[in-house]
Design a protein with these regions (language model features):
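Short, solvent-exposed mixed-charge patches
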Residues: 196-197
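A cross-family detector of function-defining hotspots
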Residues: 2-26, 31-32, 61-107, 136-188
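Membrane-proximal helix-loop-helix units in multi-pass membrane proteins
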Residues: 115-126
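A motif-centric signal for short, conserved binding hotspots located
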Residues: 109-113
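Second-shell loop/turn segments in exported
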Residues: 44-52, 85, 127-136, 165, ...
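Short N-terminal edge-element motif at the start of the domain
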Residues: 19-58
Length: 197
C-alpha cells in the first residue's frame, strides 16, 4: 500500500461548515493565468481544451473560459479546508472535477481550486490536454523517463503507470502521471494526468 485517500461522505448532524464568507479570498484574486506553457513537464502550466491554467487553478478561472457548473445549487459552498465533487460542462462535454477549498472559511464553489486535470485516449476528441514541455497523449515512455532523469526527477513505474515527481516529499502533492495501455502500445501514453497542490 503506497497511498490512502479517505473521505467521509456522510455529514454528521452537528457538523459546522464554518462561517460562509462572501468575499473572494486573496488566494483566488492573486491567481495568474499563464501566458504560455513552460519547457518543463513539472511546470504547473497546463493547456486544457484550448485554455491555459496554472494548477491549482480556481474554479472561477474555468467559468471565465466558458465552463458551466452543473447543479451548482446542490453544493453552493464548501466548508473551510473541504472538498466537493462537481461536474462542469463546456462544448457539450461534462467533466467531473474534485475541487478544494484552500481557505479556513466556507466559500463559494467558484473560489475552490482544481488540483488535477487528466486526459485519455478514450475521452472525446473535443477534450484536449497538453502539459508543459509539449507533452500529450502518445508520449514515449523511454523519452519521458529520460527527460525526468535529465532534470533529476524521480520516475516510478507501477504496473501500466509511470509517475514522475521532483522529490520524495512531492510524490502525492506534485506529479505527472501517465498510463500505458498494454493492449494497444505499452510505450505510448494513453492517458496524461497533472496534479499540483
Amino acid at each position: 500500500l503506497k497511498e490512502v485517500d479517505m473521505r467521509n461522505f456522510e455529514e454528521p448532524e452537528d457538523y459546522d461548515k464554518g462561517t460562509v464568507s462572501d468575499e473572494v479570498p486573496d488566494i483566488v484574486t492573486s491567481y495568474e493565468t499563464p501566458t504560455a506553457l513552460g519547457d518543463d513537464m513539472m511546470d504547473t502550466a497546463v493547456e486544457y481544451m484550448g485554455d491555459l491554467y496554472s494548477l491549482p487553478a480556481p474554479v472561477s478561472a474555468f467559468t471565465a473560459n466558458g465552463w458551466e457548473i452543473q447543479d451548482a445549487e446542490d453544493t453552493p459552498y464548501v466548508e473551510g479546508g473541504g472538498i466537493a465533487f462537481i461536474d462542469m460542462m463546456k462544448n457539450n462535454q461534462s467533466i467531473h472535477f474534485s475541487v478544494y477549498n484552500e481557505t479556513e472559511n466556507a466559500t463559494a464553489l467558484e473560489n475552490c481550486f482544481v488540483r488535477e486535470l487528466s486526459f485519455a485516449t478514450y475521452d472525446p476528441e473535443s477534450i484536449e490536454m497538453k502539459l508543459s514541455g509539449d507533452i500529450t497523449l502518445g508520449a514515449d515512455k523511454a523519452e519521458l523517463i529520460k527527460m525526468a532523469d535529465e532534470k533529476g526527477y524521480i520516475s516510478e513505474e507501477n504496473d501500466d503507470y509511470l509517475r514522475i515527481y521532483p522529490n520524495k516529499d512531492s510524490k502525492i502533492r506534485n506529479y505527472v502521471e501517465f498510463w500505458f495501455n498494454k493492449d494497444e502500445d505499452s510505450n505510448k501514453a494513453a492517458s496524461v494526468t497533472a496534479h499540483h497542490e
